[in-house]
């Protein structure tokens, strides 16, 4: 009680009847870094934090998360008030639709864009259209702004560290970010009008409240009107002995604008111990008095069960404080709900009260004639205006768990399905990730190729500045590529299509001499042809001959015909060393023999926006060599596109084939590491997860990929992936025994269960599906 009274005295202000809507907003001063002065020497700052996957965790994992959340709660220390806020706010549907729909380019592909846009609109209609933000707002009494700033710097460091341990990220909000929260609440429906230049306001001496306050506020006994919208604040009056850890999720799952806040004041340990001892002494005294009265009435067996239970609870609290690192908190739980009509408001209120009592025997109540005080308590200003305290331990407070499920919705991202938990749409922008390369894994029939084709469709139709190249070992993509006007390049020993293994553009190497880098590739190619590693002499000869055959080409500014493997072999024969002639003999089959398809000038159009290399008919002898040359050809494409400021997306199907050969695996790994700085992204696809992960190189590539899509997997592969990507057993259920189009995505540090279904009555579906009878 001592701390509660002290905080009340610090926050108490003389009541003045507000004359304007600006006066009801408890902001005295705003600083650029987001610190607000909300009372006499009372400063507050808000920290946004991200969600974690509590819902899909198993019981042991939930217990671990709960204990880690204890550490977050206990980290704030004494002398502060902390407000945890869950902010549900609807995004503007019209703006949202504009942001996700593909533009039309008035070409023959618009028919597909129309189908894709209709699919997106249908998904948006079934989505919750709610964004949920979570904040901690810390309020402290300090003599001046400078002292408050130093204090909040320490708080930010401690809070970030503890939330990181829990798997969450913390970000302090600046003045504009905080003011936007209040603007969007007070002026719901006009969120797009927020355009605050904080520095300009400061220079002009304007009151920031003018830019966030509503046009009107009208208060009734148990509800209020804000800009014509009905609002009501309620508070937690009581709760039973058991609190379900999903109560916060249940209360905030309503598809409406609302905020729920939990204010808690840490009680110093010595004060808490003294208070608990005094309460225990009082209960034991009442118990002794009861027993004495019963003895006087000769009723020796009588027991006051209420006092017995109360004593037991207090003893448990005392033991928790002494032996389980539990602290005591004075707590207020309040909530503001909004509606378009009084009837809807009453219905929502009734629904919330029912949810609370049903799940956790908690009792919410309406605030009577305190709606404004309740509102200012709920909103993350950092003030408390109502006296509805409950005393909770750390464990009891942590039961009001704010975490539920991770969401991913990158601005400008492509659509990848719906969150299986929240039903919200998933948008991933590879540019937002540290490394935009991705892996798609799934057994046959799991929807792997469909999901990859949908990715290709999305990129190709929406981004005219992007080129797409596919390596197709199963002739899986021909129908889609041809329908979009792309180029299918069949590569085999008997094909009339040729790719010159010696192709090299001026941008082949961004640092240093491109011939040096090309020489390394030719060494790998020769080693693949030889079937063994080249020794030091061989490498010197290869390097020398490479420089010689490229000399004239480079001197003519890369404008003459490029050398071929035949030219390279002829250069080998000119050398005096016996080893050079041995090398020439070893590669003769691939330059002048029946497998010379890569020793001739390139005669295919590689400038098309959509290219598929069909390598189905490459025989066993040509496959490893062919894969190396195709990969090198891709590197030429990527480096050339970088000069043109075009993006390149490389889709490598059945990627496990490349890891079956040492040199293709090594070259792929080199490309995988380099493509990001060239403005390109590599996407690997495979159904043979176990085979691929036998390669340490493949394991490194998968574990380092920021974007991994796991569709239905074999049991052995589930175990392997869970170890490699640190996925818990409970999370693996989302890609075990699942229907096509369902699985788990690893997006950065987020793990998101997803469902991706596409309407069957579309031309796009027929182009993307591989089901017999449905595919074109």
Model-inferred region functions:
Residues 440:
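Hydrophobic anchor at the beta1->P-loop junction of P-loop NTPases
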Residues 485-489, 697-710:
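A short helix-turn-beta junction within AAA+ P-loop NTPase domains corresponding to the substrate/partner-engaging
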């Amino acid at each position: 009680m001592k701390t509660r009274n002290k905080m009340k005295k610090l926050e108490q202000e003389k009541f003045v009847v507000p004359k304007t809507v600006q006066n009801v907003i408890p902001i005295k001063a705003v600083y650029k870094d987001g610190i607000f002065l909300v009372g006499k020497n009372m400063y507050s700052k808000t920290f946004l934090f991200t969600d974690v996957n509590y819902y899909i965790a198993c019981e042991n994992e939930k217990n671990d998360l709960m204990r880690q959340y204890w550490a977050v709660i206990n980290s704030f220390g004494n002398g502060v008030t902390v407000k945890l806020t869950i902010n549900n706010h609807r995004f503007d549907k019209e703006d949202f639709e504009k942001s996700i729909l593909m533009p039309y380019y008035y070409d023959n592909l618009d028919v597909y864009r129309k189908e894709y846009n209709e699919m997106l609109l249908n998904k948006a209609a079934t989505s919750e259209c709610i964004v949920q933000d979570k904040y901690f707002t810390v309020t402290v009494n300090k003599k001046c702004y400078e002292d408050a700033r130093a204090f909040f710097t320490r708080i930010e460091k401690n809070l970030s560290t503890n939330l990181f341990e829990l798997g969450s990220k913390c970000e302090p909000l600046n003045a504009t970010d905080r003011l936007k929260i209040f603007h969007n609440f007070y002026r719901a429906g006009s969120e797009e009008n927020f355009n605050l230049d904080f520095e300009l306001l400061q220079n002009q001496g304007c009151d920031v409240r003018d830019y966030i306050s509503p046009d009107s506020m009208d208060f009734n006994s148990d509800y209020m009107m804000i800009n014509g919208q009905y609002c009501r604040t309620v508070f937690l009056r009581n709760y039973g002995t058991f609190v379900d850890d999903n109560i916060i999720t249940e209360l905030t799952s309503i598809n409406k604008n609302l905020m729920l806040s939990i204010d808690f004041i840490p009680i110093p340990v010595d004060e808490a111990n003294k208070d608990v001892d005094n309460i225990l002494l009082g209960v034991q005294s009442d118990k002794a008095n009861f027993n004495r009265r019963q003895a006087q009435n000769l009723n020796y067996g009588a027991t006051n069960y209420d006092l017995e239970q109360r004593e037991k609870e207090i003893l448990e609290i005392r033991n928790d404080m002494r032996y389980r690192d539990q602290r005591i908190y004075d707590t207020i739980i309040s909530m503001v709900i909004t509606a378009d009509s009084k009837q809807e408001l009453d219905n929502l209120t009734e629904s919330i009260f029912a949810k609370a009592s049903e799940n956790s025997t908690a009792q919410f109540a309406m605030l009577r004639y305190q709606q404004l005080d309740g509102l200012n308590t709920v909103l993350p200003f950092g003030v408390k205006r109502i006296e509805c305290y409950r005393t909770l331990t750390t464990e009891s407070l942590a039961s009001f768990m704010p975490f539920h499920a991770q969401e991913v919705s990158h601005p400008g991202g492509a659509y990848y399905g719906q969150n299986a938990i929240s039903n919200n749409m998933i948008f991933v922008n590879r540019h937002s990730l540290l490394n935009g390369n991705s892996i798609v894994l799934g057994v046959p029939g799991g929807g792997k190729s469909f999901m990859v084709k949908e990715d290709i469709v999305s990129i190709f139709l929406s981004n005219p500045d992007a080129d797409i190249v596919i390596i197709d070992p199963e002739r899986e993509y021909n129908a889609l590529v041809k329908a979009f006007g792309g180029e299918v390049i069949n590569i085999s020993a008997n094909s009339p299509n040729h790719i010159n293994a010696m192709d090299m553009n001026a941008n082949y190497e961004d640092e240093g001499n491109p011939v040096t880098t090309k020489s390394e590739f030719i060494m790998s190619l020769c080693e693949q042809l030889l079937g063994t590693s080249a020794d030091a002499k061989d490498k010197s000869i290869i390097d020398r001959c490479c420089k010689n055959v490229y000399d004239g080409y480079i001197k003519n500014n890369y404008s003459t015909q490029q050398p071929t493997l035949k030219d390279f072999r002829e250069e080998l024969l000119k050398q005096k060393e016996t080893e050079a002639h041995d090398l020439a003999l070893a590669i003769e089959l691939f330059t002048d023999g029946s497998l010379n398809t890569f020793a001739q000038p390139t005669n295919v159009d590689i400038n098309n926006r959509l290219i598929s290399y069909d390598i189905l008919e490459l025989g066993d002898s040509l496959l490893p060599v062919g894969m190396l040359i195709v990969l090198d050809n891709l590197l030429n494409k990527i480096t050339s596109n970088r000069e043109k400021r075009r993006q390149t997306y490389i889709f490598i199907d059945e990627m496990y084939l490349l890891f079956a050969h040492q040199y293709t695996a090594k070259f792929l790994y080199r490309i995988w590491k380099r493509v990001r700085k060239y403005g390109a992204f590599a996407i690997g696809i495979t159904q043979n997860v176990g085979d691929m992960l036998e390669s340490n190189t493949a394991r490194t590539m998968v574990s380092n990929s920021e974007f991994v899509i796991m569709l239905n997997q074999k049991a052995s592969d589930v175990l392997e992936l869970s170890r490699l990507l640190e996925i818990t057993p409970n999370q693996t259920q989302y890609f075990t025994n699942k229907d096509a189009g369902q699985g788990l995505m690893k997006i950065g540090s987020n793990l998101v269960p997803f469902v991706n279904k596409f309407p069957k009555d579309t031309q796009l579906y027929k182009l993307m599906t591989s089901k017999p009878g449905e595919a074109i």
